[in-house]
Amino acid sequence: MCIRDRSIRKDKNFYDGNYHDHDVIPKNGLKTARMLGHITYLSEEHMDNRFGRRFQDSESKMNKGIDFEIENYLQYKGNQFSESFDANSYILMTKAMDNYDAGKSMGLIDSFKSIKAKLLIVGFYSDWLYPPERGKEIQLAAMQNNINSSYVILAGDHGHDSFLFHTDKYSKIIRKFITS
């Protein structure tokens, strides 16, 4: 079990996933899980540029014990998420993402043999969650199966979240790919 899931399951309000029966929500665990996950969505460069080692001003602190801006930001994001997302759904969704492996049963190259469509693989240099090397593996498997594929790595300083901020960069690539 990963740290993210464990933080939810260890919350006193989780009740083995039956928290709705007790009219509670495992907010602390869900908040911690999201804070941990959120770190992997951002890049080191983005976090350094946005927060550095700056101290949080006392007027806008989320709660006591917070010293740095990054802590305050993660607390805010965790609180926001715990108010709007179901803990069991988060566990299932992240477990599905963690366990997905296109080449698990037969290898990536063989798993691509039945693909008839052309492929566009887009990545960002700063993405820790799906680093550019994974996209290259996908394109190599496609090429070994004579699949028409394009692989593009874009600059973006927001890590995995770069696709949310640099839509102009990849929307042109997607449009060109679809119309070709």
PLM regions with names:
Residues 4-80:
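Alpha/beta-hydrolase-fold enzymes
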Residues 76-77, 92-111:
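Active-site nucleophile elbow and catalytic-triad environment of alpha/beta-hydrolase enzymes
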Residues 88-95, 172:
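Feature representing long, continuous alpha-helical segments
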Residues 112-116, 143-145:
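Short, conserved loop/helix-junction motifs that constitute active-site signature segments
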Residues 115, 121-123:
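Short beta-strand/loop motif that positions the catalytic acidic residue
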Residues 125-127, 156:
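Acidic beta-to-alpha connecting loop that harbors the catalytic carboxylate
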Residues 128-137:
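Conserved alpha/beta-hydrolase "acid-adjacent" motif
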Residues 136-180:
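Catalytic active-site module of serine/aspartate enzymes centered on a nucleophile-bearing elbow/loop
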